[in-house]
Amino acid sequence: NGERAPGSKKAPSGFLGTR
């Protein structure tokens, strides 16, 4: 989760990419 999510742009991969 969070590899290419909208949250992963700022946070590292898998940090808060679920949002």
Curated annotation (Swiss-Prot):
The protein's role, per its UniProt record: Myoactive peptide. Increases the amplitude and frequency of spontaneous contractions and tonus of hindgut muscle.
GO cellular component: extracellular region
Protein name: Tachykinin-related peptide 3
Record keyword Cell membrane present: no
Superkingdom of the organism of origin: Eukaryota
Tissues with expression: Midgut.
Annotated compartments: Secreted
Major subcellular location class: secreted
Signal sequence coordinates: none
Residue list for modification Arginine amide: R19
Organism from which the protein derives: Rhyparobia maderae
GO process annotations (BP): neuropeptide signaling pathway
Keywords: Amidation, Neuropeptide, Secreted
